[in-house]
């Protein structure tokens, strides 16, 4: 790293991993530039289930209370066959009485993390509409090349963290073990909370091993705090 200067890291991608990492680095008094391809952060994606290990990270970030306020507590998983019999009936308390999960919309999670990042505005800077194509490493820095607002982007950093998703083209090729798409797919939708089912359970309905439907409680989204999903 450059001597007599505070370290300056780049994080490529403003998803949950990138934003959480930015917060942790800023806590260590490290300058962070978030490089995001999108022109602005928008609600995208569907719900996800935070496991106890993930919740421990948000507690460390000081964000657990906000995650619990916006998300939905999930105490277990039930998987039902067409006959009505349960294929899966698993509950967190079977592992530990204090364990649980939290269902939450991906955009809500990013909203919580983004707000926390704004608290470190003297250390975290945002460069939106920035598309990175190439990284060039030297002995003491990483050169980041791409475009920003349609113009050439070229900047050196002490370190670069690649957090732009599972389909990132920036990872070393030797890290990519599988480069073929899955031979199956899924459809997602966001609907109001289903009160006919236990709202603390991740419900799954199985038709053999080829078809499954799931209903995950995900709490609320910031712009509609009274509508649970």
What are these regions (language model features)?
Residues 114-115, 119, 125-229:
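Conserved FAD-binding catalytic core of PHBH/FMO-like flavoproteins
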Residues 2-17:
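Beta1/beta-strand and adjacent pyrophosphate-binding region of the FAD-binding site
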Residues 17, 40, 167:
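Conserved Rossmann-like nucleotide-cofactor binding loop
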Residues 46, 50-116:
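Active-site-adjacent segment of FAD-dependent monooxygenases/related oxidoreductases
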């Amino acid at each position: 790293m450059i001597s007599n200067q505070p370290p300056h890291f780049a994080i490529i991608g403003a998803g949950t991993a990138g934003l959480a990492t930015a917060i942790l680095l800023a806590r260590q008094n490290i300058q962070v530039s978030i490089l995001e391809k999108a022109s602005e952060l928008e609600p995208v994606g569907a719900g996800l289930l935070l496991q106890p290990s993930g919740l421990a990270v948000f507690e460390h970030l000081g964000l657990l209370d906000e995650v619990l306020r916006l998300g939905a507590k999930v105490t277990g998983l039930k998987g039902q066959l067409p006959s009505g019999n349960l294929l899966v009936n698993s509950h967190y308390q079977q592992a530990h009485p204090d364990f649980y999960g939290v269902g939450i919309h991906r955009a809500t999670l990013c909203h919580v993390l983004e707000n926390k990042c704004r608290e470190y505005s003297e250390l975290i800077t945002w460069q939106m509409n920035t598309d990175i194509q190439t990284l060039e490493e030297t002995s003491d820095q990483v050169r980041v090349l791409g475009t920003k607002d349609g113009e050439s982007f070229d900047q050196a950093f002490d370190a670069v963290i690649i957090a732009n998703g599972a389909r990132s083209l920036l990872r070393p090729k030797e890290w990519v073990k599988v480069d073929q798409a899955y031979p199956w797919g899924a459809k997602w939708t966001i609907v109001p909370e289903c009160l006919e089912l236990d709202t603390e359970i991740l419900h799954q309905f199985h038709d053999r091993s080829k078809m499954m439907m799931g209903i995950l409680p995900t709490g609320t989204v910031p712009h509609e705090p009274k509508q649970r999903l």
